C-alpha cells in the first residue's frame, strides 16, 4: 500500500460503498465523479431521489458490506452506531476491500479491525478517527503495514479553516434570527426547538 509508496490498484470501475450519505459523502461522490465508480449508499434518512441525483444506488447495510471494493463510513456516533462495524461486519466484506473511517472512532470496533487487518481478511484501512484520541503509542494499528493513519486532521486545509469559520458564524446568525442552521444534524428536535427552516419563512 501507500506506506511503501506502491499503488497496486485503480479506483476506475470499482464499487464505492457509503455507510451514511449526508452532506459530506455526497460531496465525496461529486468529487469522484470522473473515476467511473459505481456508488452504493446505505442511509435510511436520505431519499432515493437524492441518491439518484448523484448516481448512487440505494442499498441495504449488508449489501454495501458485501459488494463494495471501498467502504467509507459517514455516520454520527450514537448508541445505535457504536461498533456498527465489528467482527461480523468485517467478515461480510470482500477480501480486497479498503475501509475508510472519517466519521467517529467508536463507530468501528478497533480490536476487530486489527484482527481483520492482521489476518489479511480485508486489504486495508484508512483511519482519521480512533476510539481513543490521540491514538495511543501502544496501539497495534501503528505497527500494521496495511493501514494509513491521520490524527483527525485529514481534511484540514487553509480553505477548510476559512469555510469552517464562515459556516460557524452563519449558523449562529441563523439561530439568532430564529432559523435552523443549514447544517443541523438532529432532525428529531426540529419540532421542539422553535426554529423554522429558511424555506418555510
Residue ranges and their predicted role:
Residues 96-201:
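Rossmann-like dinucleotide-binding domain for NAD(H)/NADP(H)
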Amino acid at each position: 500500500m501507500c506506506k511503501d509508496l506502491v499503488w497496486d490498484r485503480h479506483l476506475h470501475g470499482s464499487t464505492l460503498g457509503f455507510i451514511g450519505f449526508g452532506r459530506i459523502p455526497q460531496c465525496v461522490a461529486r468529487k469522484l465523479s470522473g473515476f467511473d465508480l459505481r456508488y452504493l449508499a446505505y442511509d435510511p434518512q436520505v431519499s432515493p431521489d437524492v441518491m439518484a441525483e448523484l448516481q448512487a444506488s440505494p442499498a441495504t447495510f449488508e449489501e454495501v458490506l458485501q459488494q463494495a471494493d471501498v467502504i467509507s463510513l459517514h455516520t454520527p456516533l450514537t448508541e445505535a452506531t457504536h461498533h456498527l462495524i465489528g467482527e461480523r461486519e468485517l467478515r461480510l466484506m470482500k477480501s480486497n476491500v479498503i475501509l475508510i473511517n472519517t466519521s467517529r472512532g467508536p463507530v468501528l470496533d478497533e480490536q476487530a479491525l486489527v484482527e481483520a487487518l492482521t489476518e489479511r481478511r480485508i486489504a486495508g484501512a484508512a483511519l482519521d478517527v480512533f476510539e481513543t484520541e490521540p491514538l495511543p503509542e501502544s496501539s497495534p494499528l501503528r505497527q500494521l503495514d496495511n493501514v494509513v493513519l491521520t490524527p483527525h486532521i485529514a481534511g484540514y486545509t487553509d480553505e477548510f479553516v476559512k469555510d469552517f469559520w464562515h459556516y460557524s458564524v452563519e449558523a449562529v446568525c441563523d439561530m439568532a434570527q430564529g432559523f435552523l442552521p443549514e447544517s443541523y444534524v438532529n432532525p428529531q428536535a426540529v419540532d421542539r426547538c422553535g426554529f423554522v427552516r429558511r424555506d418555510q419563512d
